[in-house]
Amino acid sequence: MAFLMSEFIGLGLAGAGVLSNALLRRQELQLQKQALENGLVLKADQLGRLGFNPNEVKNVIVGNSFSSNVRLSNMHNDASVVNAYNVYNPASNGIRKKIKSLNNSVKIYNTTGESSV
């Protein structure tokens, strides 16, 4: 009878260990899912602030085989969206213009000292 009791206790401890590992794994997966969802929400929020349609943003980020060629279309053109877009778009915020003017002001000299510009 004592032998059966020790087996029962051993099986109980082994089962508790497996259950504990399963719970830890489940908790880890929940945290990973939560982090992924937070990242997706943040990305969707950023694109939404730029004026993109939230449904299109969701389809692009999550993606599925039915909508592989979804294109983002700008929903509105108010001042806050335009200003936010200018921050992210180098073509419209003057950086390219500044680089071009810098390049135009820089003279390139060859080894004999003659300007090639």
Swiss-Prot record:
Keywords: Capsid decoration protein, Capsid protein, Host cytoplasm, Virion
Family matches, as InterPro entries: VP2_lagovirus
GO cellular component: host cell cytoplasm; viral capsid, decoration
Family listed: Belongs to the lagovirus VP2 protein family.
Annotated domain remarks: The N-terminus domain points away from the virion surface.
Biological function: Minor structural protein that forms a portal-like structure at a unique three-fold axis of symmetry, following binding to the host receptor. The channel formed by VP2 may allow the delivery of the viral genome through the host endosomal membrane.
Protein name: Minor capsid protein VP2
Organism of origin: Rabbit hemorrhagic disease virus (strain V-351)
